[in-house]
């Protein structure tokens, strides 16, 4: 592991803590320090963000692992994750912008996984309220207005037990040249009927309650029409997941997440361009196609109208491929922005090969500042041999079009549970974790 002087200096002067906090600091605190160091954050910003992580994130991560099985399986990180309540993202920089670091957590508290909090929302709401009192840029007006619309109206005990699970996540973005921490909240409807009503009932009413009865719903209505009437858009399905910025109301964005099972690149391009309504140059679509094929392990000669080859699991069963997107809704804009997610956790391409493909793309097209710093981060968090032979470190790459270039973000996992025994050493006849 690379020595990170700022992490070591901050650690030296932290107050005593219990074993849970010590564990999460040693693991995730060091991960955050490594990311900011490699991304070239100013030293004052590294210290500021590390202190935020130690005192405002780590206390919400719950008990330290005591085996390779999580006591509560968080949905952070999606299908690639191992149940750990935190993961990270690295938004690659541009020529003019350094990389941006984020983490995503599902706060865990005393009531998590108990009948008192079946949706695990108590700790999250308490954390958001704390952020609103300590971070001057955080405004929860939109979140508090949206949240009741997403809460299930469940009366029957059997239904509540069946639908229990995560309903809220929190994201924290730590930009290198800012003095603030930007907070996002993610809501998950637990009842299937809520998801089907999202575009027609829940979101329109939530937006009117938030922004006022005269709010412009053109962007939201476009998404509904696109998913209803467009030949390509009608193949999309709502997941129910909705993200919202916790900032001043006039700056708040609402993100609606969808998936498709059509893996042809022509379909991907049609969604990114909203059926031709958003202009994306042929050059950028060509870059996206090349990246899509490489990350998915598809042959370069595969026609863009064809589906990706079927993938199989080790047991011989099919590994279904879904492609997530989100629509970025802003009342002041007539059309939403679109972002695609490329799931590499189910790809035949190794995590290391996928990471190198993205870095190679950035270098070839003159994007990003020192993109190989990202490889240094991955190799510091996960040994190279595991990146070459195992899956799970990488979850997704997201791709949007910003200022006539591809804006790429990597989402990856600390694998705290999966790797619990990976680096054990034999000591006095006892198996001990490297984290102990």
UniProtKB/Swiss-Prot annotation:
Domain of life: Eukaryota
Function (record text): Prenyltransferase; part of the gene cluster that mediates the biosynthesis of neosartoricin B, a prenylated anthracenone that probably exhibits T-cell antiproliferative activity, suggestive of a physiological role as an immunosuppressive agent. The non-reducing polyketide synthase nscA probably synthesizes and cyclizes the decaketide backbone. The hydrolase nscB then mediates the product release through hydrolysis followed by spontaneous decarboxylation. The prenyltransferase nscD catalyzes the addition of the dimethylallyl group to the aromatic C5.
Pfam families: Trp_DMAT
Protein EC: 2.5.1.-
Record organism: Trichophyton rubrum (strain ATCC MYA-4607 / CBS 118892)
Keyword Signal tagged: no
The gene coding this protein: nscD
The family this protein is said to belong to: Belongs to the tryptophan dimethylallyltransferase family.
InterPro entries according to UniProt: Aro_prenylTrfase (IPR033964), Aro_prenylTrfase_DMATS (IPR017795)
Listed name of the protein: Prenyltransferase nscD
UniProt key word Transferase: yes
Pathway membership, UniProt: Secondary metabolite biosynthesis
This protein's UniProt keywords: Transferase
GO terms (BP aspect): alkaloid metabolic process
Molecular function in Gene Ontology: prenyltransferase activity
Family matches, as NCBIfam families: arom_pren_DMATS
């Amino acid at each position: 592991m690379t020595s990170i002087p700022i992490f070591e200096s901050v650690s030296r002067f932290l107050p005593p803590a219990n074993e849970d906090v010590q564990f999460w600091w040693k693991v995730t605190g060091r991960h955050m320090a490594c990311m900011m160091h490699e991304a070239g954050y100013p030293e004052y910003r590294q210290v500021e963000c590390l202190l935020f992580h130690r005192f405002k994130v780590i206390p919400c991560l719950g008990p330290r692992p005591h085996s390779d099985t999580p006591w509560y399986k968080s949905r952070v990180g999606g299908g690639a994750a191992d149940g750990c309540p935190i993961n990270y993202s690295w938004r690659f920089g541009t020529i003019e912008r350094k990389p941006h670091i984020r983490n995503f957590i599902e706060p865990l508290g005393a009531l998590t996984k108990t009948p008192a909090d079946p949706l695990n929302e108590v700790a999250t709401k308490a954390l958001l309220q704390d952020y609103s009192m300590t971070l001057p840029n955080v405004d929860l007006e939109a979140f508090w207005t949206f949240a009741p619309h997403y809460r299930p109206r469940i009366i029957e005990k059997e239904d509540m037990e069946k639908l229990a699970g995560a309903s809220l996540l929190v994201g924290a973005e730590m930009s290198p040249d800012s003095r603030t921490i930007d907070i996002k909240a993610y809501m998950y409807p637990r009842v299937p009927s809520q998801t089907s009503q999202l575009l027609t009932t829940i979101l329109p009413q939530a937006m009117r309650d938030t922004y006022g009865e005269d709010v412009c719903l053109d962007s939201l209505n476009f998404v509904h029409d696109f998913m209803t009437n467009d030949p390509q858009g009608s193949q999309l399905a709502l997941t129910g997941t909705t993200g919202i910025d916790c900032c001043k109301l006039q700056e708040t964005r609402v993100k609606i997440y969808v998936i498709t099972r059509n893996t042809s690149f022509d379909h991907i391009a049609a969604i990114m361009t909203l059926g031709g309504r958003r202009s994306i140059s042929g050059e950028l679509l060509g870059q996206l196609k090349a990246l899509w094929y490489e990350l998915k392990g598809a042959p370069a000669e595969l026609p863009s109208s064809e589906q990706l080859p079927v993938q199989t699991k080790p047991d011989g069963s099919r590994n279904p491929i879904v492609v997530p997107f989100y629509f970025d809704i802003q009342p002041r804009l007539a059309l939403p922005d679109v972002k695609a997610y490329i799931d590499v956790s189910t790809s035949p391409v190794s995590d290391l090969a996928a990471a190198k493909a993205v870095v190679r793309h950035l270098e070839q097209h003159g994007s990003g500042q020192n993109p190989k710093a990202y490889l240094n981060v991955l190799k510091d968090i996960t040994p190279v041999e595991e990146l070459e032979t195992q899956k799970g470190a990488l979850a997704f790459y997201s791709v949007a079009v910003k200022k006539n270039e591809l804006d790429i973000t990597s989402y990856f996992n600390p694998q705290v549970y999966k790797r619990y025994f990976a680096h054990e050493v034999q000591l006095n006849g006892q198996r001990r974790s490297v984290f102990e």
